[in-house]
């Protein structure tokens, strides 16, 4: 099982064909926004996208929950996907058939087992998540069957959206879609509870009812794909024990009028960051306009990067 590696050159060509970009884009080598960027706090965004280059970003620490989420996403592609979109050098954005296989879970567990946790907490988390991966696959199959996308189901298609008053496009890739519907898939994995009285550790699955931790961020991502495609949204959230499917039919937040309201939040964040990039024009002085919060959970597990960031802001 492999993660998709986008050709930078082909992606840049595609973005360039969408919209004429300002000169300062070349200075920071950042030519688009994305839903995940917009959901990231300004200090973490600045460190990742204005300070680090793309190769350095690819080496940022990951954890077992991220690996587990990748596994479930790719199991979904093999389960219902017919087409996957990829950027191919010299060809641009192209469709490729997803090969059929009966060993969907075997591929996932092989990929899962290749990950080597670096901290004791992540090692314990990885052990728990391994127990839950097969259960999560069961939940995934049931949920995808309930949603019932029609063939041919496509995966990872890149779409763009221009925000009012912003110079850069917002780019994102759709998890699963058919002619009239799309699915945004989110996974929740075991969280560590307080130690028992005897000192042993226990884990529990996080809640996935409406309003769960991360709900607002996920709504923004769904809103982006809805506004970019006009298709009916399905927010599929699962853990190893259950799943929930949120649509405009059962969730007020996913009704078109409420999703459209989120465009203003996207615009505010994107425009603020564009103004920072334009003002500082490639210089590291952008830190003057972004206040860091190193106690935020985003910085947990960042290792040496946290030390670098503290020095970057002059807090050492």
Where are these regions (language model features)?
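Short, charged, amphipathic alpha-helix that recurs within catalytic cores of restriction-modification
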Residues: 211-225
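Hydrophobic/aromatic-lined pockets within catalytic cores
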Residues: 76, 80-84, 187-190, 224-230
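Metal-dependent nuclease catalytic regions and adjoining charged, substrate-binding loops involved
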Residues: 195, 214, 227-316
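Short histidine-centered catalytic/ligand-binding loop motif
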Residues: 61, 203-214, 251-252
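Conserved catalytic cores of phosphodiester-cleaving nucleases, focusing on short active-site segments
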Residues: 72, 172-209, 224-225
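A structural signal for short, well-ordered beta-strand segments and their strand-loop junctions
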Residues: 154, 177, 181-185, 233-237
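Short, solvent-exposed loop/turn segments at secondary-structure junctions
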Residues: 160-162, 188-190, 240-243
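Metal-dependent nuclease catalytic cores that hydrolyze phosphodiester bonds in DNA/RNA
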Residues: 1-174, 178
């Amino acid at each position: 099982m492999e993660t998709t590696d986008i050709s930078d050159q082909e992606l840049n060509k595609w973005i360039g064909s969408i919209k004429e970009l300002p000169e300062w884009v070349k200075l920071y080598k950042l030519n688009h926004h994305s839903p995940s960027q917009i959901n990231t706090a300004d200090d973490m965004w600045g460190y990742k996208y204005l300070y680090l280059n793309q190769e350095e970003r690819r080496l940022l620490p990951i954890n077992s929950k991220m690996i587990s989420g990748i596994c479930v996403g790719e199991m979904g592609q093999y389960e219902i996907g017919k087409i996957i979109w990829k950027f191919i050098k010299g060809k641009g954005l192209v469709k490729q058939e997803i090969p059929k296989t009966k060993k969907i879970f075997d591929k996932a567990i092989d990929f899962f087992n290749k990950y080597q946790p670096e901290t004791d907490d992540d090692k314990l988390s990885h052990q728990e998540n391994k127990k839950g991966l097969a259960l999560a696959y069961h939940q995934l199959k049931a949920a995808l069957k309930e949603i019932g996308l029609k063939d041919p189901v496509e995966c990872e298609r890149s779409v763009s959206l221009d925000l009012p008053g912003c110079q850069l496009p917002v780019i994102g890739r759709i998890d699963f879609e058919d002619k009239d519907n799309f699915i945004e898939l989110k996974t929740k994995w075991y969280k560590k509870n307080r130690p028992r009285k005897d000192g042993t550790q226990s884990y529990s699955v996080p809640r996935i009812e409406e309003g769960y931790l991360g709900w607002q961020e996920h709504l923004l991502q769904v809103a982006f794909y809805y506004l970019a495609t006009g298709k009916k949204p399905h927010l599929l959230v699962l853990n190893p024990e259950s799943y929930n499917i949120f649509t405009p039919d059962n969730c007020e937040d996913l009704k078109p009028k409420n999703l459209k309201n989120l465009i203003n939040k996207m615009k505010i964040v994107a425009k603020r960051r564009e103004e920072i990039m334009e003002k500082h024009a490639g210089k590291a002085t952008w830190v003057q306009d972004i206040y860091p919060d190193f106690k935020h959970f985003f910085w947990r597990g960042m290792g040496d990067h946290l030390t670098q960031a503290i020095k970057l802001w002059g807090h050492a």
